[in-house]
């Protein structure tokens, strides 16, 4: 906010229910968040500061200035505003703080924990940094928290993983569930993340 020098400016807006600005989208007015701006400052400040350059002919000329800004926290607010449901955030994979969350349903069980850690380590070796939920909480709490955080892929490791020798992979965006052996789930994760 505030007045910048220069005759031309552009603001880049993202529609957002709680936005402080109102913009026209099609024929309707919608609330929006400013996520970026450009101000063409010309030579107003460079001339005053003596910020010059030599042109091709050796003449001293004032620099033509511009101001470009991206509001990172506003951009994240805009992304969340566009990518959520009643359960929480649904991070786009490209900007998710973590691509994979491993939910350990019984962290007190050594075999379950060992399996979860092996998944964690294999993903790390592949250049994928997972988030490990090894808290001593009920599974329902972990599922709710995982959806709230919005990590794109959730790997569920529990008693069934040991019994059936499988893992469950859940996608946050569409709630799709895949149950397959560990190696196939790891391959699926790498394919989804690395293409």
Identify the residue ranges that each predicted region occupies.
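NTP/phosphate- and nucleic-acid-binding module
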Residues: 1-195
